[in-house]
């Protein structure tokens, strides 16, 4: 999924949502961490809605410190099973999503990435850029200390990926699409496989934060919420 494109999002002129809260609650009751998926495939237009949901999801400071990989290649999915002790059955789902998070160098103020996001994407004027510099600097160095280490920086960037994943899962439930968030993999080995061996992302800038499977349940639910 591409990020960093200059896009105007019509929030002010967008229609106010108009649906009963019972619909949302029913979707949340219907949703569960699906263990086995059927062979049914999500229609392309429906999955596009989930990708657009990801794009519109909020992130801290609007920096979008994440990226999405949609893994549809069956051969690659088989390779992933070696380093995914808790994802094997879920790799049979209609769509399998890997959420990446940026590393410390990219989320340090003054980096090419942050400058690109603020200047090129959000097109903030110089005075707002300076405000971001002070506010984000204080946040990352003093308040949350996100830049104390490579790990703390990646964990913070990864939190943004989890926000995006959660939004996708909620909208999926509203559409009758099942999902399962996944952490059952070996990050170092999966980074090497997808990033270094297959070249799907630059491991100098990204690491895998979390994964999720989307599709339709292939099992009966035995436990009520």
Question: Can you name each region flagged by the protein language model?
Answer:
Residues 2-225:
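Acidic, surface-exposed loops and disordered segments
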């Amino acid at each position: 999924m591409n990020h960093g494109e200059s896009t105007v999002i019509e929030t002010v002129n967008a229609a106010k949502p108009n649906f009963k809260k019972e619909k949302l609650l029913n979707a949340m009751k219907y949703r569960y961490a699906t263990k086995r998926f059927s062979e049914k495939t999500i229609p392309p237009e429906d999955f596009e809605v989930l990708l657009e949901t990801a794009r519109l999801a909020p992130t801290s400071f609007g920096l979008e410190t994440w990226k999405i990989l949609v893994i549809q290649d069956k051969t690659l999915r088989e390779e992933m099973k070696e380093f995914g002790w808790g994802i094997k059955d879920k790799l049979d789902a209609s769509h399998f999503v890997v959420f990446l998070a940026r590393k410390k160098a990219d989320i340090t103020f003054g980096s090419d990435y942050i400058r690109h996001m603020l200047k090129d994407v959000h097109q903030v004027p110089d005075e707002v850029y300076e405000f971001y510099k002070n506010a984000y600097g204080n946040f990352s160095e003093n308040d949350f200390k996100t830049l104390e280490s490579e790990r703390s920086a990646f964990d913070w960037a990864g939190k943004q990926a989890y926000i995006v994943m959660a939004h996708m899962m909620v909208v999926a439930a509203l559409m009758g699409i099942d999902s399962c968030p996944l952490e059952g993999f070996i990050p170092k080995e999966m980074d090497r496989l997808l990033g270094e061996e297959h070249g799907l992302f630059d491991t100098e800038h990204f690491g895998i934060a979390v994964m999720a499977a989307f599709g339709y349940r292939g099992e009966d639910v035995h436990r009520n919420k």
